[in-house]
UniProtKB/Swiss-Prot annotation:
This is Chaperonin GroEL. Forms a cylinder of 14 subunits composed of two heptameric rings stacked back-to-back. Interacts with the co-chaperonin GroES. Its EC number is 5.6.1.7. It comes from Mycobacterium scrofulaceum. It comes from the Bacteria. Belongs to the chaperonin (HSP60) family.
């Protein structure tokens, strides 16, 4: 029963991360798994679950604050290309994404689909 709850939690974390950020699901899944594993270990060792929850919430608050302070606005086509290239692990993909974003603008939508066409 606990394993199923933990698995559902991790699945929800990955889905929410993908919905909000579109990237980082692996990192979010690994972090969620570690939190569940260590949380259960601490509770089994006698830790107060509510105190543990409050501690996790404080840690999340601090991490969020630190990430927001270090975040940089990505505005220019070159910045978008560089950021997308890092995310995709490929400069040519980064350039394509930047070009697409430049064409549709800030409010536009870009849909990427897998093609079954070989060689095109």
């Amino acid at each position: 029963p606990y394993e199923k709850i933990g698995a559902e939690l991790v699945k929800e974390v990955a889905k929410k991360t993908d919905d909000v950020a579109g990237d980082g699901t692996t990192t979010a899944t690994v972090l969620a798994q570690a939190l569940v594993k260590e949380g259960l270990r601490n509770v089994a060792a006698g830790a107060n679950p509510l105190s543990l929850k409050r501690g996790i919430e404080k840690a999340v608050e601090k991490v969020t604050e630190t990430l927001l302070k270090s975040a940089k606005e990505v505005e220019t086509k070159d910045q978008i290309a560089a950021t997308a290239a890092i995310s995709a692990g490929d400069q040519s993909i980064g350039d394509l994404i930047a070009e697409a974003m430049d064409k549709v603008g800030n409010e536009g939508v870009i849909t990427v689909e897998e093609s079954n066409t070989f060689g095109l």
